[in-house]
Regions:
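Short, acidic, metal-binding catalytic loop of nucleotide-sugar glycosyltransferases
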Residues: 23-32
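Active-site nucleotide-sugar/metal-binding loop of Leloir-type enzymes
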Residues: 64-79
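Short beta-strand-to-loop acidic/aromatic patch adjacent to the donor-nucleotide binding site
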Residues: 77-88
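Conserved donor NDP-sugar-binding/catalytic core segment of glycosyltransferases
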Residues: 92-125
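Short, flexible, basic/aromatic active-site loop/helix in glycosyltransferases
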Residues: 128-147
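A short, conserved alpha-helix in the catalytic core of glycosyltransferases
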Residues: 149, 153-156, 160-165, 170-199
C-alpha cells in the first residue's frame, strides 16, 4: 500500500530557521508527496517557496487555525505529517511513518522519537541537531501505544479525520498549547495512537517567534481545563497534573529565571487564569486581551 503523505509546517516569525528545516527535508529517503508551509503574514515565509518545491499559504493567526488550513490545502492526502519549523527529522522519518501506518490501518496518530529537545533549554543550533542525527541508531521495531502525539512531529490519518469531521480546536488561540493532545485524544476514539522510534528527529526549540510569558502562562491553566471540560477524552486529572507541574516550575524559577524563559510572566499568566476561574470567566480566548 502506498500512502499519499504530505508534510505540513505551521510557522510564525522564523523564516531563516524554516528555510533550514526545508533544506533538511530534501534528505528524506521517502520523499513527501507535497510540502506545504503555512504562515500568517508574508514575512513568515520569505524564501520558503524557493526550496524543494515547498508550497506556501497564509492563514489567520493561531497554531490550530494554521494546522486546519494545512489540512484543507491537502484534500488528496492520506496522512499529514506535522513538523514544527524547527524540527529536523532523521532521513528515514517518512519511510518509517509509511511502513507502520500503511501496515497497520488502525493507527490514527503516530508521533516520533525526539532524540534531543531544545525546548527545555536555550535551544539547539542546526549543527548540534545534525550531529545528533548522524549518531542516532533508533530501533526499527519500537512501536508503543502513547497518550498523544507531540505537535513538533506528529502524523495524523486525514482519512479518519475527514470521516468523522474532526479538526484542530480553534478556540485555542495563538500558540495552541495542548491542541496536539486534544486532537490525539479525539482521534483515539477511532484507532490507535502510537510512538514510532524509527521516526526520530531533533527539536531545536528555537526561542525566537514565541509568545509573551503572560499569555503562555494563562494558556497553561485555561487550555487544559477547557479541554477537560469538553469531555472528549482529555481527563481532568491530566489537566490538573499539567497545570500543577507548570505552575510549580514557574514558582521555583521565578526568583532566578533562566535567561531564555519569561518565568515571571508565565506565573503572572497562571495567576490571572486562576483569578478568572474563580470569577467564572476563564476561557482560552481571553489571552488575546492580555
Amino acid at each position: 500500500v502506498t500512502l499519499n503523505i504530505v508534510i505540513g509546517i505551521p510557522t510564525v516569525g522564523r523564516a531563516p530557521i524554516l528555510r533550514e528545516t526545508l533544506r533538511a527535508l530534501a534528505r528524506q529517503s521517502r520523499r513527501a508527496d507535497r510540502i506545504i508551509v503555512c504562515g500568517t503574514k508574508p514575512s513568515d515565509v520569505v524564501g520558503a517557496a524557493d526550496i524543494h518545491g515547498a508550497e506556501v499559504l497564509l492563514s489567520s493567526p493561531g497554531l490550530p487555525a494554521q494546522r486546519n488550513a494545512l489540512i484543507a490545502a491537502a484534500p488528496q492526502a492520506d496522512i499529514m505529517v506535522f513538523f514544527d519549523d524547527d524540527f529536523l527529522p532523521d532521513p528515514d522519518y517518512l519511510a518509517a511513518i509509511e511502513r507502520h501506518m500503511a501496515g497497520d490501518p488502525t493507527i490514527v496518530v503516530a508521533t516520533g522519537l525526539v532524540l534531543k529537545d531544545g525546548i527545555g533549554g536555550p535551544g539547539l543550533a542546526v549543527n548540534e541537531a545534525e550531529a545528533v542525527l548522524r549518531t542516532a541508531r533508533p530501533s526499527p521495531l519500537g512501536v508503543l501505544p502513547t497518550f498523544s502525539g507531540y505537535g513538533c512531529n506528529m502524523a495524523v490519518r486525514l482519512t479518519t479525520m475527514r470521516q468523522h469531521g474532526l479538526r484542530f480546536d480553534e478556540r485555542l488561540p495563538l500558540y495552541g498549547w495542548q491542541e496536539d493532545v486534544d486532537l490525539s485524544r479525539r482521534l483515539a476514539a477511532y484507532g490507535e495512537v502510537v510512538k514510532i522510534d524509527a521516526a526520530c528527529g531533533v527539536h531545536l526549540g528555537v526561542k525566537q517567534g514565541r509568545n509573551s510569558g503572560v499569555r503562555l502562562g494563562y494558556s497553561q491553566v485555561a487550555n487544559p481545563l477547557y479541554l477537560a471540560g469538553k469531555g472528549a477524552g482529555y481527563p481532568l486529572m491530566r489537566a490538573l497534573e499539567h497545570i500543577g507541574r507548570n505552575m510549580a516550575m514557574n514558582i521555583i524559577h521565578a526568583a532566578r529565571p533562566e535567561p531564555y524563559v519569561d518565568r515571571r510572566g508565565r506565573l503572572r499568566g497562571n495567576l490571572l487564569a486562576l483569578a478568572d476561574l474563580i470569577r467564572r470567566r476563564m476561557v482560552p480566548e481571553r489571552v488575546l486581551e492580555l
